[in-house]
């Protein structure tokens, strides 16, 4: 429970804002900070919260991303080589970065393209037979279809599924999904979440007869998170690779702003 009229804590933002859980009011605190044209070093994935880097930047009296020495940069196999340097450089020139491979990567994918997203819910007291407390129950999917490169995806063209109470919800979820994505084309997801849901569904007693079809769907999945991490960055993303941040950086008529 919170008191909206209580004063803001007289303490600087720091690691405590995310421990033991992320505070829901960080945006409120950030809005009170002095406005600055400086991009903070905390946008750097993984090392932005590194204790040694934080102590170094404190000793220098700055939070400026451009002041981070390269000795702190680290490579990760799921990101572009030198991605910390890429982020630093492209915040400096305020331009997006593309790998030379990006165009060729998409040439390898076959149309139609399907863009698939799942939502799950955890129930403290499960109401669906065969589930347990805090089991991730899939209750919603949406699929947007792109027939060819010269077509345009419209939001109202999406197919979707939504159910909360049907005792056979998982069976209906996967049956309707398999029908929506057909048997051909490339299915894009953002992260491994959708695959993990499909893997669990094919082992459910009421879905085992669909296991082969689910496996074929899984074989068509392409993870856009992996593609973006290795091949694209924009200062508008502020070091984050979520769909909400990527949308800000690419030409689109879609917005997550409320």
Where does each model-flagged region fall?
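Conserved DEDDh/DEDDy metal-dependent 3′-5′ exonuclease domain
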Residues: 1, 156-258
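Short coil/turn segments at secondary-structure boundaries
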Residues: 9-17, 101-106, 258
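Short conserved micro-motifs at the rims of enzyme active sites and ligand-binding pockets
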Residues: 30-36, 125-128, 231-237, 258
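Flexible loop/turn segments at secondary-structure boundaries
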Residues: 32, 96, 121-125, 150-152, ...
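Helix-hairpin-helix
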Residues: 34-84
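Charged, flexible boundary elements
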Residues: 79-105
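Conserved RNase H-like, two-metal-ion catalytic cores of nucleic-acid enzymes
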Residues: 97-183
């Amino acid at each position: 429970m919170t008191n909206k009229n209580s004063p803001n804590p007289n303490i600087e933002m720091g690691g405590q804002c995310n421990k033991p859980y992320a505070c829901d009011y960080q945006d409120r605190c950030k809005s009170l900070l002095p406005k600055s044209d400086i991009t903070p070093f905390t946008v750097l994935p993984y090392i932005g919260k590194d204790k040694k880097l934080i102590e170094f930047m404190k000793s220098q009296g700055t939070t400026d991303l451009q002041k981070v020495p390269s000795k702190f940069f680290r490579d990760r196999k799921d990101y572009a080589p030198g991605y910390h340097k890429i982020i630093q450089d492209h915040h400096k020139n305020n331009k997006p970065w593309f790998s030379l491979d990006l165009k060729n990567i998409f040439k390898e994918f076959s149309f139609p393209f399907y863009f698939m997203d799942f939502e799950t819910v955890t129930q403290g007291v499960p109401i669906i037979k065969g589930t347990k407390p805090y089991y991730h129950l899939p209750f919603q999917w949406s699929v947007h279809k792109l027939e060819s490169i010269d077509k345009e995806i419209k939001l109202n063209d999406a197919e979707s599924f939504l159910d909360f109470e049907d005792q056979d919800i998982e069976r209906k979820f996967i049956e309707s999904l398999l029908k929506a994505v057909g048997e051909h084309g490339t299915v894009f997801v953002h992260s491994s979440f959708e695959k993990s849901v499909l893997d669990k569904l094919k082992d459910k007693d009421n879905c085992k007869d669909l296991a082969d079809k689910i496996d074929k769907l899984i074989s068509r999945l392409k993870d856009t998170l992996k593609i973006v991490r290795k091949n694209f960055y924009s200062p508008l993303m502020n070091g984050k690779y979520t769909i909400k941040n990527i949308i800000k950086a690419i030409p689109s008529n879609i917005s997550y702003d409320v």
